[in-house]
Amino acid sequence: MWPQNEVYITGVNMGTKLGGYIQDILPNPGLTWEKARILNIGIDTRLFSDRLSVTAEFFKDNRHDMYVVNNKISSLVGNVKEFKQNIGKINSHGVDLSAMWNSNIADWSYFIGGTFSYSTNELIANGEVDQPYEWLKNQGRPLGENRGYIAKGFFNSWEEIAASPVQTFSDVQPGDVRYEDINKDGQIDVNDMVPIGYGDIPRIMYGINLGVGYKGFSITALFQGAAKVSRQYSDIVMNPFTDNGTIFEHQLDYWTPEHQHATFPRLTTLDNASLNNRQISTLNVKDADFLRLKTLEVAYDFPTKMIQKIHLKGLRLFLSGTNLITWTKYKWVDPEAPSLAAPLTVSYTHLRAH
């Protein structure tokens, strides 16, 4: 109930200062645990002599009385910074589906299965203050949604800069990112930040698992994917010379007076000079949907009669690979870990097992 105590200094500065305690944040003796109303409806069935199995589940999770800061309380009533109350509310819902088909045709066997998951939420109440513009509100929007500026390309001349709204982040020059003035007040600032894309957590995740076998030979594959997800590229991906580093090959497509239709803004080694270009915007937040061939395995299981002669219970030769192919519009880095510091690992394994 007492979120914080701070030191209160009294007296003159002679010798060692004596410390004491003051009340910094008002307590709330009426706090309670958050509450939830949860609904789950599901089915689990097998059909066609157990060759087809299906599982489906719908869930709804409405939480209220969440412990959040009430920013609507005026400071006129006293020091109420970070005063928390049970006023938060968020509603979530989604669906999980999975299915698998197994069958045989003569000496052939095969299976194909899939999973699908969708979830989303809506922030109903969080104690935020009234906003001057509808697009600044968090209430009524999904939790964790990306917000930023709308990038409108690059400034190509000083005349274009003079005729444009003032960008308040740092001094700009030709080659810097030009942002859209959403509220039309003649300057670019936090009031021009709008929802862009989705959040970092995918709303949709899915997988496909399939395989075929014939007289000891088998091929299996697993595909995984995600959709309705947006990620911000890290500084090292977007900005050359970050942390005294180098310039990467993909960053060579930078703005120059002779190359105005570039992917990246002008080159600079000064952090302050490029502060304008480092803002969260549609330039560095992109859709990170992907489909990946996660694993692929080709194998042969030797017949039991053959390996019994050498006193083995089982012998398998296989070649497997991991993260072999990824289909995505999210360039340069792994869409699941968008940093050049964490490259996607592709691996192959060729083993004998017994």
Where do the model's predicted regions map?
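Intrinsically disordered, low-complexity regions of eukaryotic proteins
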Residues: 8, 46, 98, 173, ...
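Extracytoplasmic gating/loop element in the C-terminal half of outer-membrane beta-barrel translocons
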Residues: 226-316, 321
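A short local loop/turn or secondary-structure capping micro-motif enriched for an aromatic residue
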Residues: 63-64, 198-200, 228-230, 335-337
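Bacterial peptidoglycan biogenesis and beta-lactam-recognition machinery
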Residues: 49, 58, 217, 223-230
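A surface-exposed, glycine/aromatic-enriched loop/edge motif typical of exported proteins
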Residues: 1-11, 51, 122-178, 234, ...
